[in-house]
Design a protein with these regions (language model features):
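Terminal disorder- and signal-encoded targeting elements
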Residues: 1-270
């Protein structure tokens, strides 16, 4: 599809089209867009933290542009004659939303499709390391195994996300401090340090706390022979989407004290 634009500058062409003067091929909430209605653009795919655009090598277009949800140009490339693919870095600080991928020449938009870039990170499972020591990372110390949590998360969205916070609140021995400046996620190759891992669309990963939420001690909860029940919340924070998700869990403490306590957790019903 070719739409002539009465403009003298290429950037004006891009922003005008982004504002809605061009009908584009359908937008998908999966990680990629096949583009039967996208003219010379055959496919747009999210590959990790990059956007891969495939197009007709014989296109008349001379450039490629990616327009952000705001209507501003997110990226621009000159096309190499005879090439059929361009890769655009997305990174982990992009504004989430619907982007428009365009093939352009000096005075017109040759083809365009929409692509969703929006992370959606969910908690799939949570385990106390003390109850599953075999699932902790190699080299974890005994106190770390006693105190930390393993969280399985999945990105069911269409864009990558950098995890910047893993917080715990509620009826646990050591809630996450409000003034914590680090992520609260352990770097497993250097477990005494924090990390901010990236999770790509479609990926499932385990992350490990490093704030000792279930360390023995503290006066927030007590462990009793008859059992003490409570509830706590797990919060994930991302660089792109902000607060991504929170999940509540029921917890029971049974034993003489927190240094000799059986702790069981179960996902709370919504």
């Amino acid at each position: 599809m070719t739409h002539s634009i009465p403009s003298t500058t290429r950037r004006t062409v891009l922003t005008t089209i982004a504002a809605g003067s061009l009908a584009v091929a359908g937008c998908t909430d999966s990680g990629s867009t096949d583009s039967p209605g996208g003219g010379d653009i055959s496919r747009v795919d999210v590959d990790g933290i990059e956007l891969v655009v495939e197009y007709d090598a014989e296109t008349s277009a001379t450039g490629l542009a990616v327009i952000a949800p705001s209507g501003e140009a997110f990226a621009e490339r000159q096309l190499t004659p005879g090439a059929s693919q361009e890769t655009i870095p997305i990174g982990t600080a992009y504004p989430p939303g619907t982007y428009t991928v365009q093939l352009v020449d000096e005075q017109s938009v040759v083809a365009a499709v929409e692509q969703s870039l929006r992370p959606d990170v969910v908690i799939r499972d949570l385990k106390l390391a003390r109850n599953h020591p075999e699932e902790m990372y190699e080299g974890a110390a005994d106190f770390t195994i006693t105190s930390e949590v393993i969280v399985t998360i999945e990105n069911i969205g269409t864009g990558p996300e950098e995890l910047t916070g893993l917080h715990f609140d509620g009826d646990i021995p050591r809630p996450t401090p409000d003034d914590l400046e680090e992520s609260g996620i352990a770097a497993v190759n250097q477990p005494v340090t924090y990390t901010e891992p990236v999770i790509n669309p479609g990926d499932t990963i385990n992350v490990y706390s490093i704030t000792f939420p279930f360390a023995p001690g503290g006066d927030v909860v007590s462990c009793t022979p008859e059992g003490t029940d409570g509830r706590f919340t797990v919060i994930l924070i991302g660089n792109v989407a902000g607060e991504l998700t929170e999940r509540e869990y029921n917890v029971t403490y049974q034993g003489q004290d927190l240094t000799d306590c059986q702790i069981s957790v179960k996902r709370a019903e919504s």
